Structures are given as C-alpha cells and as structure tokens.
Amino acid sequence: MTLLPLAGWRLTVARSCSLLLLLVAMAMPALARDSGPNPWEVVDGLLRQGGEPVPDLRRPRPTVSKVEAAELWDAFLTRVVKHAAGESEDAARRQQFLLVLLSGRYDGLELLASEAPVPEPLRKLFLLSWDRLAPELRQLTKELDSQAAKSLRALLEAGDALRAAQAFSDAIGLPVTPQTLRELARLVLPAGAGDPLAYDLALDPDLRLLFGFGPPLPAAQPSGLLGSSLPAAMADNRNWFIATAFAAPAPLLIDPETAALARRLNDWLPTRSDLPEYLPAMRVLLQRTADATWQQRESVGRAIEPQFNELYRDLVLSTAWQESCWRQFVRHKGKVQPIQSGVGAVGLMQVYPRIWRGFYDVAGLQGDVAYNGRAGAEILHHYLRDYALARREAATAGDADDLARATYAVYNGGPGHLNRYRQAKQRADLREIDSSFLKKYLAVKEGKELEVGKCFSGAASPR
C-alpha cells in the first residue's frame, strides 16, 4: 500500500472535512445549530499547525451503551442496505449487501459478548462496517442512472468524510451519534419513512424476498410446554401473513404427517428413558425438514447441485446435534424454557434472533421446534450455496467434507469465519468447536447419528 506524504494526507482529510461540512449544512441542520466552537474551524487550525490533535477533555463523551449501539447501528445498516439492495436488479450484488448486513450484525453480537469496555461503541461499529458498505455502494452507483445514484453518492460522500474525520474526533467533537446516523440515512430514504433508527424484531417479508429467501416460513405453533413463559415482547406475532405481492414464490410446504410429528415433538421434554423413541422421531423431523427446505429453495431459484443433497441433509442433522443435542427445550430451575446460549442463540438450531431479525418470527424460534428447525435449515442452505460452494471451499484440499466444515464455521461465527477451520493459527476455543462439529458430521455421514444420545446428561444447557 502506498502511503500519502503527510502534507498530502492532511489535504485529503481537509477536503473530506470540507465536503462533510457542506453536507452537514445541507442535511444536518440540527448539528449546524449546536452552540460552541465550530469543529471545522478546529480542523482547519489543526491542519495548518501540524502535529497531533489535542483532545478537548471538557467535551462530554457520548453515553450510548453497548446494547443501544448494537441496536442503533443494526437499524441504520438494515435501512440503508435494504434501500440500496432494492435499487439493484443483480442477485449477486444483493448477496453482497446481505453479506454487509450480516457482518455488521455479527459485529454487534461480538460487541455484546465481550466484557471489555468500549468507550464509543457506536463509533466502533460504524468504523467496522463502513469499509464493507462503502465499496458496495460505490459499485452500485456505477450501475445506476445518474438520478437514481444521486442520493447514494451523497450518502457515500458524507459517510467517507465522517470516516476520515474520526482521526480528529477527540479534538473536534464529531462523534458518531444517533442523530448523525439519522441524518445520513435520510440522505437516501424517502420522506416520511419514519425514524431510520427504529429497532424491532418483527418479521419483514420484504427483507426475505429481497435477499432470495422467499415468503415467510409457515406459521409457528407455540409449544404447550411453555404456557405463558415467553416474554410479552415475544408473544404471538401475526405479521407472518403473506401479502398478495409476496405470494408468487412457493412457500415451504409441510405434509400432514410431518406436521403431526412436529406437534408431538414440540410438546415433548425428553428424559433419558425416552431416548429410544424420541431420537428416531427427531431424526425423521430433521431429515424431512432438510428435504422440504431443499425443494423450497429450488422453487425460488436458489437451487444447489443435486450431488450435494446428501451432504446438506447430513449438515442439518450434525448442526442440530452440535448446537442443542436435538433439543428445543430444557427444564431450568423447575421451569421449561427454550435452550438459549449466553449471547442469545435459541432453540434446536441455536438461531440468533439479533442476527436474523426480520427474516424469522422470534416467538416461533423460541417456542416451536419445527419452526426453529426450518429456520436453521434455511440458513445452512444459504451458507452452503452462497458461501462455501460459491467460494469453492472444497477446491482447496479436494475434499467435499470441507464444504460442510466451512458452512458450519459461518453458521457458528458469521461470514468472516468461512475458512477458519483450515487456518493454522486459530483461537483454541474455535478450533475445539470445529473439531467437535467434524466428529459429529462424520458420525452422521456414517449413519451413526443416533449417537447424539450420548450428550443427553440432564444438564440445563446444550453443551
């Protein structure tokens, strides 16, 4: 990488700051009215004087918590990505925007999982995601006519300038705040679009269709084991009804026999003595879920080559084994509840509601083993098709099993983990997870999937 001379670098930042100042005046009147020294005058002085910026310790620091930052950034990123992807007719381009969205959500999840203090979590998430988002926006503007690209260019220029200005944020008082993100989003969103930082867990059929997932999954049937134990915010949500505009692709169909099996398993909290009956029944449900998902994905134009059908089916069974020991519920402190990890993954397939918000009904993920299984199978199909196969993971060592290993690595850790299983230097905990999964996958491949019974210990957690 060629480094700019110091003077040239300062000039670049100065131009970026000047551009952002212009955009602030046009698009961020609230910021322009703030009392106190003009931060851009401070920038100009710093650039003229040279040397390192001196932080203004009198200026209060932002007070956005990690949780607030994760939700605010997710809301912003989702609205911008959804708008940008909707401007493109290229399915591959849309998948790149989905990659940006999922990566940004995993950034938020990692932020929440870490105990390390982060002084400005919203700024951290902006810096992590902008370098992924900006190139995709820039490429999209080249594919659109000038009028359609105009608002995206405005967002790009403002975002790039804000990114450059972060080098001086302590000195000039230009933190990444919720209001900053609102004004950036409003550069591209239509008038009357509402608060671009509004965050909820409701199902969004538009989001599913935009990224090739098709209509919402069949409605969840909450387990009678839970009674009223689910939080009120997760109560039955009927936003899954498919509007006429979304009825064209074929939904995932569940035959009556499989539906009856799912209802039976959904009201079953197995003990060790139940395993000879419970495990074969769950195997049937998982196999039928994999087969139905395979067919449904084909019907919406997301097919995978037939030679990978068996691999995919084995992948679904082994992932459910790895994630939950084929269970949806456990009894904890005398109360039946969905299996949930420390960072919020839930149910049979340990699906993250935060990562997949908008794609799935959260109450269904928590309260219906069949719904959770269908969601996990759909996510695995996406990662197998659009990541492991698309990026030719099997070609590295010539081993088709690497497709399963790569798919699970992404399922477990997010898009940035695709090839972690073959990296010589890897965190010990991730290496252990990948090794554990491979053992289970190979057992399923050899027809030994009922060995899942060995992990039933009566404990309250899946692992």
Predicted stretch roles:
Residues 3-342, 378-379, 384-401, 415-463:
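Cell-wall glycan-active module
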Residues 314-316, 345-348, 370, 408:
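Extracellular structured ligand-interaction cores
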Residues 335-362, 372-382:
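Substrate-binding/active-site groove segments that recognize
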Residues 365-367:
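Short pre-active-site segment immediately N-terminal to the catalytic Zn-binding motif
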